[in-house]
From Swiss-Prot:
Location in or out of the cell: Cytoplasm
Any one GO biological process: DNA recombination
UniProt-listed NCBIfam families: tigrfam_recA
Family, as annotated: Belongs to the RecA family.
Function in brief: Can catalyze the hydrolysis of ATP in the presence of single-stranded DNA, the ATP-dependent uptake of single-stranded DNA by duplex DNA, and the ATP-dependent hybridization of homologous single-stranded DNAs. It interacts with LexA causing its activation and leading to its autocatalytic cleavage.
Name this polypeptide is given: Protein RecA
A GO term, aspect molecular function: single-stranded DNA binding
Stored Pfam families: RecA, RecA_C
Organism: Chlamydia pneumoniae (Chlamydophila pneumoniae)
Lineage of the organism: Bacteria, Pseudomonadati, Chlamydiota, Chlamydiia, Chlamydiales
Residues involved in ATP binding: 67-74
Length: 353
């Protein structure tokens, strides 16, 4: 078959497919504009946005945030919700754990009056609600907190102690098969928070695994492994926050295995001033000599905690340094990358103030 005949045969096949399955069921990838631009939602931590390679979490995709207890999973997801709202979007929170604190969410920046929340009775209801919200096309981000709390209906109806093998894994697999296509069409970002468990009898390798089976690992475009690596001390030597390390364990949209570190403060959430300070030092915008920090040959102060508070107070200085960081990023076109091993939970260490 020569080239003109092949083109005619292809055009006839495409016409028949569109007639059979509807317009847009098959198209040229290059002409499909949605493939060229990926809409994202910022995470609240600039260092993590850079590690993701696309300056945020993508819309229309499944995201998994997993880690041990008190590692900042819910805080990170809540910041994504707050940033989606700041962009004019609508957010929904499926609180399967029944543990969302409205006052803390409001402190982070969430407009709780506009936040849609659901506290379903069982896992099937939670995932059905998520699918219906995504299908509406009116929701920008849906947070499911958490996968471990999505209890199958048959398990709820049984007695404590009954053995239910693979129920949750089958439920997640069935739901994600339906949900992923809906999310892509509606450009809704689904953020699944997950817990970790220990595999029994593992002598070599990492014994940690996540709940809900393998389906979520496969369907996730991005998986974030979040760990607490130290505590942050205030001027009176009391704990005021945690130092957090996030490894991009999977990334379908940029190179994976990048690592980002940032501060989560108890009364603030993710510290944007701390992120700016760390990146400014990394890009030599702020010079660090011992415990002193200098900017344009002027002393900003002594101690990381003092300088972070100074950047938080002085909004003009904060924005000036932030602009210079973005200029460096644009010039280099390479995000901050730290190749490292999988972050493991380590004994708490003190971050020097």
């Amino acid at each position: 078959m020569n080239l003109p005949d092949r083109k005619k045969a292809l055009e006839a096949a495409v016409a028949y497919i569109e007639k059979q399955f509807g317009a847009g069921s098959i198209m040229s990838l290059g002409r499909h504009s949605a493939t060229h631009e990926i809409s994202t939602i910022k995470t609240g931590a600039l260092s993590l946005d850079l590690a993701l390679g696309i300056h945020g979490v993508p819309k229309g995709r499944v995201i998994e945030i997993f880690g041990p207890e008190s590692s900042g999973k819910t805080t990170l997801a809540t910041h994504i919700v707050a940033n989606a709202q700041k962009m004019g979007g609508v957010a929904a929170y499926i609180d399967a754990e029944h543990a969302l604190d409205p006052s803390y969410a409001s402190l982070i920046g969430v407009n709780i009056d506009d936040l849609m929340i659901s506290q379903p009775d069982c896992g099937e209801d939670a995932l059905s609600i998520a699918e219906l919200l995504a299908r509406s096309g009116a929701v920008d981000v849906i947070v499911i907190d958490s996968v471990a709390a999505l209890v199958p209906k048959s398990e709820l109806e049984g007695d404590i102690g009954d053995v239910h093998v693979g129920l949750q894994a089958r439920m997640m697999s069935q739901a994600l098969r339906k949900l992923t296509a809906t999310l892509s069409r509606s450009q809704t970002c689904a953020v699944f928070i997950n817990q970790i468990r220990e595999k029994i009898g593992v002598s070599f390798g990492n014994p940690e695994t996540t709940t809900g089976g393998r389906a979520l690992k496969f369907y996730s475009s991005i998986r974030l492994d979040i760990r607490r690596i130290g505590s942050i001390k205030g001027s009176d030597n009391s704990d005021i926050g945690n130092r957090i390390k996030v490894k991009v364990a999977k990334n379908k949209l940029a190179p994976p295995f990048r690592i980002a570190e940032f501060d989560i403060l108890f009364n603030e959430g993710i510290s944007s001033a701390g992120c700016i300070l760390d990146l400014a030092v990394e890009y030599n915008i702020i010079e660090k000599k011992g415990s002193w920090f200098n900017y344009q040959e002027k002393k900003l102060g002594q101690g990381r905690e003092f300088v972070r508070e100074e950047l938080k107070r002085n909004r003009k200085l904060f924005e000036e340094i932030e602009k210079r960081i973005y200029d460096v990023i644009a010039a280099n076109k390479t995000p901050s990358v730290h190749a490292n091993e999988t972050p493991q939970e380590v004994p708490a260490q003190t971050v020097e103030a």
